């Protein structure tokens, strides 16, 4: 989870490769569609087979925006692995999220995909993924990668 007190933006990541970008609203909004951004990190990786759970189903259609945090974009990353790291650049409105398979950067203002980068081995040996647990060091690397990318876009 990441919260920016200046902009009122809240970004919440989940365990099925999804994260939601919300803005703080002082009034209830009209019914609206929330844009869904999908990103597949491993389409170009031969031999990769995801054996985990399926992504969450996202409810289609407009819904009433309540008072408080209102969703502005929903991002679904495939494979649907847990979101390990989130970063936000208020000056550019960029949101970065990292998983065990790579990272995604979206434009939080226009709700579009900016970049998706797979961080899996180029050799195609994915057998380590079967029972691989992410260590604190790996989480730190993902978080630093997100921060570095956002820093150099400023």
Show the residue positions of the predicted features.
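Canonical WD40 repeat/beta-propeller blade segments in eukaryotic WD-repeat proteins
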Residues: 1-3, 42-55, 77-88, 125-130, ...
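Conserved beta-strand element within WD40/beta-propeller blades
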Residues: 3, 10-14, 95-98
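Beta-propeller fold detector
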Residues: 31-59, 63, 114-128
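A short beta-strand motif characteristic of beta-propeller blades
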Residues: 72-76, 112
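Surface loop/turn motifs at the tips and blade-to-blade linkers of beta-strand repeat domains
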Residues: 75-78, 118
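WD40-repeat beta-propellers
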Residues: 19-24, 103-108, 117
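Non-catalytic interaction/regulatory modules that flank or connect domains
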Residues: 87-93, 101-102
């Amino acid at each position: 989870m990441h919260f920016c007190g200046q902009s009122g933006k809240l970004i919440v990541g989940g365990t099925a490769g999804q994260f939601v970008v919300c803005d703080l609203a002082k009034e209830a909004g009209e019914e609206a569609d929330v844009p869904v951004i999908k990103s597949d990190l491993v389409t170009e990786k031969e031999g990769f087979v995801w054996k985990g759970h399926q992504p969450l189903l996202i409810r289609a259609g407009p819904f009433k925006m309540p008072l408080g945090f209102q969703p502005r974009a929903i991002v679904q990353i495939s494979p649907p692995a847990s979101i390990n790291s989130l970063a936000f650049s208020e000056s550019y409105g960029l949101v970065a999220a990292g998983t065990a398979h790579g990272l995604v950067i979206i434009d939080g203002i226009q709700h579009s995909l900016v970049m998706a980068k797979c961080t899996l081995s180029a050799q195609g040996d994915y057998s380590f993924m079967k029972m691989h647990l992410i260590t604190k060091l790996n989480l730190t690397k993902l978080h630093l990668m997100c921060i570095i990318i956002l820093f150099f876009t400023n």
